[in-house]
Structures are given as structure tokens and as C-alpha cells.
């Protein structure tokens, strides 16, 4: 019984040896460490697998009905202050442990091949293992101080990995942007922690919740101050989980390697904010205004993220805005008190989004030898299309992740999102309408990404990458500004140098990736006489596909752990059993179940909205659009005059909103960043001219006084003695007449 619990403190330290040994190896014996660099990937996977075994054992005990376990070590104790460190094992901890270790293992296996060409391979694995260790430490923390320490470590690792390719100016700027934005949230979190300690006198979660509840129920607390502290705590979660308005760092974070994008969006950085809200849920639930504020931020983020994803060309940024929107759903669920649905969607979204990001990495990996290693080209969906026959396994798994995020049964996200939608309707019809509408938008933009990537023809061979001005041959927006004409290759061929010189599809400005780069014979276009041989994408290697396929299985089956169907014979709802200790703390005698009729009616409505979004995306981007266009149905619609012009204006507004990131970055740049820079310049000028002027003036004055005395003295000792005695005499006279 609970034999694993006393040793659970080991879990956060299990991945650390790789970070320490790689760091020491690169400092002491760099050449020997680099020669065995691929070995560190195996060790990383092995150690994290050991952590997974611990996590599975703990989770089985939690599902079996084990109680909450906490162990503390006293750090410092006196009469007025005590600080303890330890670990807390409950259902929330066990869920997060499983999530971090499973996704982390898949990312490690995937990264071994994905990063094999990079000179920073060892540095990447050192950061990655430290990232996993920090997140494991965060979810097992037993008090707010411990959480804050690991919170900062998680942030530090994310900054290092976002700016991993720091020689790229865009990556360096993205790292800086993530750091500055999260500083705002982290400062709020620190103030909130100090405020809660002022109220309760404790950092430990159990004591803090108990004391806070007593104070609220007895009305012996200033509710405004308590709400302010809770808001500051939530500010940390807003920044970490990329909620409005501190979401601006998330799209730029795509400058990091794709495996890191998968880990950040699935199980670490953005999940940390959700975890904090879930951990402090017993505190927030006593403050109704804070719960409403959480739900409001969530619903705004749901809609904003979906609208910003509509017109993105970068495949990773499209997925980033999707993450922002889905995390908004989770925050909405937390705010309306649907604790179970929030954690359920956290689980299902994590596996689906990890699958999509690793799938996008496989796509990027296949496109890089053709278009070059610039993210502007290898991640650009304009240059993709028709990849189904080149990367069939990636296509199948990517489709699974897309359908899951769209909310199509029986895939994972269908079960959790449907539960959030139903609960939101009970809480607020307005919130429910926005949530249901965004579900349709989610289906639209996700299927848009899928169709632009895999449907149609490979557009790279019909696109001019050499900088010559030419009309685009394929429309990638829904606004109908340009028509597709993939059959006419004369436009492309006319751009080729008439002297029959070799034409490369590489960008003229490429990024050096080191001596480990793969040498692929089919990575460029060559002329053989008058015939052009085009390169084509290729399927990823087996280790990358293994991770993608395993995550595909999770996406297929993980939703079944939370099926809310209990007819008295078989209870499929493993998640409720898993969460029983935590749910009982929040709601006494709580039991979650839904009958068949209600469940089916709600599911039909939500799936219909998702299918409508998929239909619109297929009509505008898929083969259906081409078929209708050949029948001139679109052209007949275009002749409707004023109605068509009005519709185009609306679509252009939506397009510009999405393409310009909702103008939020622009507003921050104009009114916040610029003013802060001016204030910094003003304070710098004040410091340089006044503060430094006083300090330097004293030094300069002393110098000139010394020089004057030097010339007066002339170097004779008798003169020095005369001046010295004169000063002493004057001093004694002054003392005698004015003091005595």
C-alpha cells in the first residue's frame, strides 16, 4: 500500500544526470563527449522511462482510491516563520506526471533524429532534460515557494530553447519577447504569493486552503485584498499559458526547434499555468468574482486565438494560435467550476497537439532539403500541398490530430471539448454561444492547415523563389484575391534563366547547420538538357515516425478514460475515479454522470458545427472548390455586384485582423514598448548627466585641488610643514573661540 509514495521525491531528479554530465563533459572533455553524443539520447529516454514507471505506479494507486500523500522537510523554523520543502502526491500530480513523462519520452525519441544534423545537439538534450526535470519538480511541489522556484526554472529552460538558434535575429528577439512578457506574470505571481502569506501565514497548500476558507466563511478577511492577491496569482498563469493579453510571446516562440514547440505546447510551459490554476482551485472557488474573471479571460482567449489562426501561412504559428484558443477553453472550464472537464481537455489536447507539432516537424523536415533551411520557406504552407503521396504516414497521423482538435468522435478532444461546451451553456448562454461558434472556427482553420499542406499539388514547383516579380499561382487565403492555375507551368518556366543555368530552390540566405547535415542527392533541381528534374519531399526516418504513431494511438484512445457514461453495469469513467480525492475536497459527495440521451443530443449539435467548419474549409481549399469553380458557380456568385463587394470588404477586415495578429502587437509596440524605451532613455540620461556628473565632479575637483597643492608646495618639505602647521593653528583657534 502506497509503497512508491515515500520515494516519489526522486522523480524530479531522475532526468538531471544527463544535464549535469553533458555540461561537465562539454567543459572538461568536449571532443570525447561529442564523439558519443548520440548515446545521450538513449540515456535520456531511459531515465525518463524510469520516471514514467514511477508515475504509472502512483497513478494506479490514485485510481484505486488512495488518499493524498504529503511529505515535508523543515528548512528553517523559528517562532515567527517556518519554511518547509517537500512533495505532494494527489490526483492532479499523478495526471501531470503521466502527461509530462509520456510526451517527454516521445519528444526525446523524435529529437534524436530531428536534431542529429545540428551542432547544438548535446546542448539541446541538456536543456531538454533540465526542462523535464523542472516541470516534474513543479507539479510535485507542496508549497507556493517551491512552485515559484520551479516556475522560474521552467521559464528559464523555455527561454533557452526558444532562442536555441540564437544566431538568428528572429530567434533572439522571440526569446527576449517571451522573457519580458513572462516577467510581468511572474512579478504578479510573486506579489500574490507574498499577499497570501500575509493573509494566512503559510505557504503550504493544505494549511493555506484551510485557513483561507475559515477566514472567508467567518468574514474575517478583507475580500478586496484577497481578490487582489488571487488576481495577481492568476496573472502568472495568464502569462505562462499565453492567455489574453499576455499571449503575444507564443507565436514568436515557434522560432525554437519543432520538438520544443511540441513539448512547450503539450506538457510543460503552457501547461504550467493551467496546473497553477488547478492547484489553487480550492482558493479561487471561494472568490466568485475571481472565478468570473478567469472564465472571462478564457472565453476572450478562445475567440481571439481562433480568429488569429484564420489566415496564418506558417504551419507552426497556425498551431500556436490553436494552442492559445484551446487553453482558453481550459481556462473557461476552470472559471465556470468545471474542474474535471478542464483537466480532461488538458490531457486530450496535450496528446493531440504534441502529435500535430511533431507531424509539422516531419513536414518541415521533408521540405527543408528542397526549399532551404529558412523557416520563412520550410514552414510556409504556400510552398506545400500535395504531400499525401510523399509522406503518407505523417499525413494519416496529422489527420488524426486535426480531426481530434476539430472535435470529431471518437477521437480524444471530442469528449473533453463537448463536456466544456455543455457546462458553459449551463453557466452562461453568451459564453456558450461564443464557445460553440469558436468550435466551428477551430474546425475551419485546422482543416485549412491540413488541406493547404496535403491536398492538391506540390506548389513549390510552381512558385518563384528567386525574387523575380511574378503573379502568385495559388491562392492560400479564403478571400479569393488570386486564382489557382496549377496546370500552367509556363509562368514558372519563364522565370528560369534563359542561359540554361542551374536553378536552385534554396534561399540565397541560408543558415549554417553544421557538419552533421545530411547529404541528400535529391535536394535540389538540376537541368539535364531541356528537361527539369524536380525534387520531392520524403517521409521521415523511423524514429521520428515512431513517436508520431505512438501519439496517434494516444489521440485515438486517451479520450475513453473520461467517457461520462454510467448505466450501472460498466463504468467507463476512469478519470472521475482518478480525480475522486480532489473532487471530494471541492464538492462533497460529487458524482459526475450523463445519461445516453442527453449526451447524444449535445454531441450531435457540437459535431454538426465542427462538420460545418470542415465543409467550408474543404469548399474553399479542397478539390470540391476546384470542381465547383470549373462549373462557373463561383463566377456566377461573383457577378452579384454590391453584395459581393460588401462580402469582400468583410473578408478583408477578417484577413487583416488575423494577418496583423489582431493589431495587439502593434498596440503594445506603439503605446507600451515605445513609452518604456523613452522612459528608459530618460532615466539613463538622468543617471548619466546628474548622478554620474556628481560622482565624477567630486573626483575631478579632488584632482584639480591636488594639482593646485602640488604646485604650491613645490616639493619642499619645509613648505609642507608650514602649510600643515598653519591649518592646525587655524583649527585650534576656531575650536577655542567658537566651541569652548
Curated annotation (Swiss-Prot):
Class of enzymatic activity (EC top level): translocase
Alphabetized Gene3D superfamilies for the sequence: 1.20.5.2700
Keyword terms of this UniProt record: Chloroplast, Membrane, NAD, NADP, Plastid, Plastoquinone, Quinone, Thylakoid, Translocase, Transmembrane, Transmembrane helix, Transport
Gene Ontology molecular function terms on file: NADH dehydrogenase (ubiquinone) activity; quinone binding
Catalytic reaction(s) noted: a plastoquinone + NADH + (n+1) H(+)(in) = a plastoquinol + NAD(+) + n H(+)(out); a plastoquinone + NADPH + (n+1) H(+)(in) = a plastoquinol + NADP(+) + n H(+)(out)
Family matches, as InterPro entries: NADH_UbQ_OxRdtase_chlpt_su5_C (IPR002128), NADHpl_OxRdtase_5_subgr (IPR018393), ND/Mrp_TM (IPR001750), NU5C-like (IPR003945), Proton_antipo_N (IPR001516)
Keyword Chaperone tagged: no
Predominant place of localization: plastid
GO biological process, one term: electron transport coupled proton transport
Compartment(s) where it occurs, according to its Swiss-Prot or TrEMBL record: Plastid, Chloroplast thylakoid membrane
Annotated membrane topology: Multi-pass membrane protein
EC number: 7.1.1.-
Record-level GO cellular component terms: chloroplast thylakoid membrane
Transmembrane intervals: 9-29, 40-60, 89-109, 125-145, 147-167, 185-205, 219-239, 258-278, 290-310, 327-347, 354-374, 396-416, 425-445, 521-538, 545-565, 599-619, 720-740
Annotated family: Belongs to the complex I subunit 5 family.
Function: NDH shuttles electrons from NAD(P)H:plastoquinone, via FMN and iron-sulfur (Fe-S) centers, to quinones in the photosynthetic chain and possibly in a chloroplast respiratory chain. The immediate electron acceptor for the enzyme in this species is believed to be plastoquinone. Couples the redox reaction to proton translocation, and thus conserves the redox energy in a proton gradient.
Subunit description: NDH is composed of at least 16 different subunits, 5 of which are encoded in the nucleus.
Protein name: NAD(P)H-quinone oxidoreductase subunit 5, chloroplastic
Taxonomy of the source species: Eukaryota, Viridiplantae, Streptophyta, Embryophyta, Tracheophyta
